[in-house]
Regions:
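Glycine-rich phosphate/adenosyl-contacting loop at the front of the ribokinase-like
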Residues: 1-63, 68-75, 79, 249
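Conserved phosphate-binding/catalytic loop of the ribokinase/pfkB sugar-kinase fold
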Residues: 89, 100-144
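Hydrophobic beta-strand scaffold residues
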Residues: 58, 84, 164-165
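A generic structural signal for short hydrophobic patches within well-formed alpha-helices
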Residues: 125, 196-197, 229, 303
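Conserved beta-alpha-beta core of the PfkB/ribokinase-like small-molecule kinase fold
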Residues: 135-210, 227-228
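A glycine-rich helix N-cap at a beta->alpha junction
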Residues: 76-93
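Short beta-strand scaffold segments in enzyme catalytic cores
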Residues: 49, 97-101, 109, 228-232
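Conserved phosphate-binding/catalytic region of the ribokinase-like
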Residues: 1-11, 32, 156, 173, ...
Length: 312
């Protein structure tokens, strides 16, 4: 990276193939649809792509295969200005890919092939990058070579004063134990409502947020779709971040990743907690208005113009 502030995103890197609008029912034959779009995606790569669109100097650490999908991801990220020096190519493995048919109402089905993404390595170069970044977004919970070792790069980054955020994707039976290990190094943990309930066993979101904070995270933001987000700050104050109302939802697949990117981008620009969360919600709303990872997001200023005004 050439200039601060810098963000390092670590973890899931995939390509999303979005088809819309479709009828989510079995059929035999050919149907014409409006669009098929491809984009780099995933809790790490999607966040990196959106952050770069918001003019954050961003680097991605992840893994792809030596195939057309991997070359596409790399090329699109480079075109967007993302540093891909830490994007590994793993021989003999396919790139992670996700097929997402979406109907006219925004409902979707998701078909995911894990591929190389979960097998990224814990390298010295990754540790060095984490130690120098202004912010680290960790989206690697469940990665075989990272679970149990995240503290090796998160602890030095936190000691340096970097902003450390974390998100989940499809948590499994070992995710809660991994979170108990790494949340003491996390400033803001940002799971979805489904993920928060799964890992804590709490159906009540405020109780889930408190449980996650008790595991060591500085603050918790639980993303809850059209209901906005539940935020528990580092002082223990609980609040709700309303979702930005939009006329038509097109594709919500990357809304969680874009929320994270928006929060990080605003925080790195010095926005206080409340303003950063509202900017995050505005960013997610722009992504929901169009297909694939970026939706109709064009710039930081565009998102800022629709963020709800308040004192912070």
């Amino acid at each position: 990276m050439t200039h601060p502030p810098s963000l390092l995103c670590i973890g899931l890197t995939t390509v999303d193939v979005v088809a819309l609008p479709v009828r989510l029912e079995p059929f035999d034959g050919v149907r014409l649809i409006d669009a098929v779009q491809m984009a780099p995606a995933g809790t790490a790569a999607g966040t990196a792509l959106v952050a770069a669109k918001l003019r954050v100097a961003t680097q991605l650490a992840g893994a792809v295969g030596p195939d057309a999908a991997g070359r596409f991801i790399r090329g699109e990220l480079i075109h967007a200005g993302v540093d891909v020096a830490l994007l590994e190519v793993l021989p003999g493995l396919p790139t992670s890919a996700t097929l997402i048919p979406i109907d006219a109402a925004g409902n979707r089905m998701i078909y995911h092939s894990p591929g190389a993404a979960a097998l990224m390595s814990l390298s010295n170069a990754l540790k060095t990058a984490a130690a120098s970044a202004s912010a680290v977004h960790y989206a690697g919970v469940g990665a075989r070579n990272l679970d149990g070792h995240a503290a090796e790069f998160l602890a030095p980054a936190k000691a340096r004063g970097a902003l450390i955020t974390c998100d989940l994707i499809a948590p499994g039976p070992n995710s809660a134990a991994e979170l108990r290990r790494l949340l003491p190094y996390i400033d803001v943990f940002m799971p979805s409502a489904v993920e928060a309930r799964f890992v804590t066993g709490e159906s009540d979101l405020p109780r889930a947020a408190q449980a996650l904070r008790d595991w060591g995270a500085g603050a918790i933001v639980i993303k809850n779709g059209a209901d906005g987000a539940l935020a528990l700050d580092k002082a223990g104050r609980l609040g709700v971040v309303p979702a930005v109302k939009i006329d038509r939802v097109v594709d919500t697949t990357s809304c969680g990743d874009s929320f994270c990117a928006g929060f990080i981008a605003a925080t790195l620009r010095g926005r206080p907690w409340g303003q950063a969360l509202r900017f995050a919600a505005a960013t997610a709303s722009l992504v929901a208005r169009g297909p694939a990872t970026l939706g109709v997001l064009e710039s930081y200023e565009q998102a800022d113009s629709i963020a709800a005004p308040a004192s912070g």
